[in-house]
Amino acid sequence: MEGKMANVYDVLKERGYLKQLTHEEEIREILGKEKVTFYIGFDPTADSLHVGHFIAMMFMAHMQQHGHRPIALAGGGTGMIGDPSGRSDMRTMMTVEMIDHNVECIKKQMQKFIDFSEDKAILANNADWLRNLNYIEFLRDVGEHFSVNRMLAAECYKSRMENGLSFLEFNYMIMQAYDFYILNHKYNCTMQLGGDDQWSNMIAGVELLRRKDRKPAYAMTCTLLTNSEGKKMGKTAKGALWLDPEKTTPYEFYQYWRNIDDQDVEKCLALLTFLPMDEVRRLGALKDAEINEAKKVLAYEVTKIIHGEEEATKAKEATEALFGSGNNLDNAPKIEVTDEDFSKELLDVLVDRKIIKTKSEGRRLIEQNGMSLNDEKIKDVKFTLNDNTLGLLKLGKKKFYNIVKK
């Protein structure tokens, strides 16, 4: 657990969470002096949080550990509109039943990070005030504080103008700003936290409170979880890396972190574990074969936070058992691949590297469930590699290869 610094701002800064802040000096001062109620919103687009939400949950957890009160806001109302930020198309519309089911699932996962006992944190759902909103009153009360010109200049809308932005989605920013307004009135919430892709929406909430009520309001964004090449982390051969063990097993989850790029280890240890920063820096400074020890620590710590100590230990032991008989991934023969290989079928790459003699040999292995990548069976004979499908390739029972990018 992080040693108690006087101010959580310094902890967040040192660990690399902070990206953009509305009033940096004021925020640092109030976080050091007051108990702040803050919120982060989660739209229920699926019945599980994924690794992209993980960093926001850690952001909340650090704030709570330093005496501040989190509100985890489930978007049961905004989820019916869909956030256009970072999207080139319109989200599929979900039914009320789907949204409510997803909200319940997400609430359970949040309790792994946040202590909701004795009013230490609040679980709220914006469906409570958005679904039965009086449209005319809302327009008169809130709409007058928004400039359409300024809204259209926001990055989240600008990128959508060419492909078409629906009026439904155009309302999202105002709805999110209204959430902040309501949470301020109900719980004296004065700060919003969120991913950096939410910056435009968050500024709207801060400005609404400051204009309408002449009250102090603040926003901080956290960095998005990207690898050393700037690509979003958390994708596997199966798709997203989920926090639900039914969707991504603890073993698969452990393996993902065990096999990340060397350059990403220190950043992930800082953002996704509670290890002291001295230890994070020590592990991050390890080189060559030694960095694998740091990856084991990362995989264990992250899996422990999400799935508990027992599942983390099981995943660690399963990995050691798999590689225990001389099949250690660090010592396994490497298959070095380039960007050019990502457009080829895996079987063609294996024939090129003389790992298998013919494609028909590879097809037979796949048909007999004898080929897996990071413990996931390959079922498609036309399977192609990409940045997120590197790691342990197993052919039959005894052949192991470490697929790495050259």
Curated annotation (Swiss-Prot):
L-tyrosine binds at Y39, Y172, Q176. It is found in: Cytoplasm. PANTHER family: TYROSINE--TRNA LIGASE, MITOCHONDRIAL (PTHR11766:SF0), TYROSYL-TRNA SYNTHETASE (PTHR11766). A motif ('HIGH' region) lies at residues 44-53. ATP binds at K235. This is Tyrosine--tRNA ligase. One of its GO terms (molecular function) is ATP binding. The keyword Nucleotide-binding applies. Its EC number is 6.1.1.1. One of its GO terms (biological process) is tyrosyl-tRNA aminoacylation. The gene is tyrS. It catalyses: tRNA(Tyr) + L-tyrosine + ATP = L-tyrosyl-tRNA(Tyr) + AMP + diphosphate + H(+). Catalyzes the attachment of tyrosine to tRNA(Tyr) in a two-step reaction: tyrosine is first activated by ATP to form Tyr-AMP and then transferred to the acceptor end of tRNA(Tyr). PROSITE patterns: AA_TRNA_LIGASE_I, S4. Keywords: Aminoacyl-tRNA synthetase, ATP-binding, Cytoplasm, Ligase, Nucleotide-binding, Protein biosynthesis, RNA-binding. A motif ('KMSKS' region) lies at residues 232-236. CDD domains: S4, TyrRS_core. Belongs to the class-I aminoacyl-tRNA synthetase family. TyrS type 1 subfamily. Residues 344-404 form the S4 RNA-binding domain. The keyword Transcription regulation does not apply. Its main location: cytoplasm. SUPFAM superfamilies: Alpha-L RNA-binding motif (SSF55174), Nucleotidylyl transferase (SSF52374). InterPro entries: aa-tRNA-synth_I_CS, aa-tRNA-synth_Ic, Rossmann-like_a/b/a_fold, S4_RNA-bd_sf, SYY-like_C, Tyr-tRNA-ligase, Tyr-tRNA-ligase_bac-type, Tyr-tRNA-ligase_bac_1. Homodimer. It is an enzyme of class 6 (ligase). GO terms for cellular component: cytosol.
